[in-house]
Amino acid sequence: MIQVSYVPREYINSCWKQVEGYLKKATEYTHGRYEVEDLYLAVCEFGHLLWIAFDEEEIKGAVITNVIVYPKKTYLCLAFCGGKEFSTWKDPMLQMLRNWAKDNGCQGLEAVGRKGWTKVFKHQGHKFLWDTFELPLDEG
């Protein structure tokens, strides 16, 4: 049976090696903005939260979130997600994150990701809001 849990900061080192590979794959879609070491620092030093999905045998997936305080609203951002057998833990993870967000004064959840995530979330009541555009600047 799949369970999901927040990982308190003092326990991150005990499970990091098991989730590092999942999260490394997620950083490959950041176009050089993040490496997996940056995610480790984010959860250990900068207030991001690590969540895991697991069964009696192994950790199946990991999500990193952070709270974003906008001038008018506060959202829990699902910043990074990775794992295997996603369909087995997606719903319990989203329910846990919804509950945590409500209990901590957030007005909603948000995620930034590639277009494929639209299919994942469309049955969950999520809506697509916008695209992001990038203009790299020459460094020379």
Give names to the regions the model predicted:
Residues E45-S87:
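Conserved donor-binding loop and adjoining core beta-sheet/short helix segment
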Residues V112, K127-E139:
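Conserved catalytic-core motifs of GNAT/GCN5-like acyltransferases
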Residues G47-H48, H123-K127:
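Short glycine-aromatic motifs
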Residues P71-Q124:
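Acyl-donor binding region in acyl/amide transferases
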Residues T118, E139-G140:
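Flexible, glycine-rich phosphate/dinucleotide-binding loops
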Residues E28-H48:
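Active-site rim helix/loop that mediates acceptor-substrate recognition in acyltransferases
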Residues M1-Y34:
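Short amphipathic alpha-helix that is part of the acyltransferase structural core
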Residues G21-Y34, A53, Y70-C81, R98-K102, ...:
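Long, low-complexity, intrinsically disordered polar/charged segments
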